[in-house]
Swiss-Prot record:
Keyword Membrane: no
Subcellular location: Cytoplasm
Annotated Zn(2+) binding sites: C297, C302, H304, C310
Protein source organism: Salmonella dublin (strain CT_02021853)
Name of protein: Small ribosomal subunit biogenesis GTPase RsgA
Length: 350
């Protein structure tokens, strides 16, 4: 997930792919303006290949074609669209998307072939869902937080399945979550099974477009089903009794409306995303508690590891930075280096 500009080589590949698509359809006439009504505002609730489902101001959903001049269209985009004139006469004629408004945010994921690929737009917050089962992974939480900081979208940490905790377990988990509360992150404890804690979560979702992110098996779909109501049920699979891991079942990204207000964009593509396309400096900036210490290390090229005079390591030793966060920072950097060894994401011929 990133707001970084593509490298020259990546941009060349994107442009080349775009030109090939244009060449294929060069001899096809674009849609006749006389077939469509007056322009109107709408929001893309799903992108389906060469078409998009657009919701109009009155809440109706219209299947639309997309002008060839529109190079990128994803769920959450605010658009100008026009209905097919024959639609008013009861004939099923697609509308057309004419233009896309400027995005306030773009969620992307790294792609080995096209650089970074946009998958959702205009997101206000990312709900990071974790759970005590199959495993409470602070490393996964930290990875998502780095993504949120890079995108500059507000995160909300939600710990699901608290009904499985006894008092001692709850104390331990609260101690772990205090690591995040103490550096300014919001944390909610909920149970999609008993619906404990759902009211504060509903309030946090109201008036915003959110996405739910997290590893498989933490109960994202069950939580969304509880929040959306059965009429909008998102498919889900129970966690495997053998592996303890869940399975993804939704496909294309789609925007849903919460009954209490607010929206969610859901799909496997927005639930899990990588960081390997980011630079190490971006990972460092993604740890908010590091900011006060950056620039104060003894050496300008400090790697914040075993370097002498490292201000961040000293803060860890003094208890000002949580040791688990510091360890996860280096785990993320190490995993990025391993992936980039297998696939060099950045171009070397520029």
């Amino acid at each position: 997930m990133s707001k970084n500009k593509l490298s020259k080589g990546q941009q060349r590949r994107v442009n080349a792919n775009h030109q090939r698509r244009l060449k294929t359809s060069a001899e096809k006439a674009d849609y006749d303006d006389n077939l469509f009504g007056e322009p109107a505002e709408g929001i893309v609730i799903s992108r389906l290949g060469m078409h998009a489902d657009v919701e109009s101001a009155d809440g109706e959903v219209h299947r639309c074609n997309i002008r060839r001049t529109i190079r990128s269209l994803v769920t959450g985009d605010r658009v100008v669209w026009r209905p097919g004139k024959a639609a008013a006469e009861g004939v099923n004629v697609k509308g057309i998307v004419e233009a896309v408004h400027e995005r306030t945010s773009v969620l992307t994921r790294p792609d080995f072939y096209d650089g970074v690929k946009p998958i959702a737009a205009n997101i206000d917050q990312i709900v990071i869902v974790s759970a005590i089962l199959p495993e409470l992974s602070l490393n996964i939480i930290d990875r998502y937080l780095v993504g949120c900081e890079t995108l500059q979208v507000e995160p909300l940490i939600v710990l699901n399945k608290i009904d499985l905790l006894d008092d001692e377990g709850m104390d331990f988990v609260n101690e772990q979550m205090d690591i995040y509360r103490n550096i300014g992150y919001r944390v909610l404890m909920v149970s999609s099974h008993t619906q404990d804690g759902l009211k504060p979560l509903e309030e946090a979702l109201t008036g915003r477009i959110s996405i739910f992110a997290g590893q498989s098996g933490v109960g994202k779909s069950s939580l969304l089903n509880a929040l959306l109501g059965l009429q909008n049920e998102i498919l889900t699979n129970d966690v495997s009794n053998v592996s303890g891991l869940g399975q993804h079942t939704t496909t294309a990204a789609r925007l849903y409306h919460f009954p209490h207000g607010g929206d969610v964009i859901d799909s496997p593509g927005v639930r899990e995303f990588g960081l390997w396309h980011l630079e190490p400096e971006q990972i460092t900036q993604g740890f908010v508690e590091f900011h006060d210490y950056l620039g104060h290390c003894k050496y300008r090229d400090c790697k914040h590891d075993a370097d002498p005079g490292c201000a961040i390591r000293e803060a860890v030793e003094n208890g000002a930075i949580a040791e688990t966060r510091f360890e996860n920072y280096h785990r993320i950097l190490e995993s990025m280096a391993q992936v980039k060894t297998r696939k060099n994401f950045s171009d070397t011929d520029d």
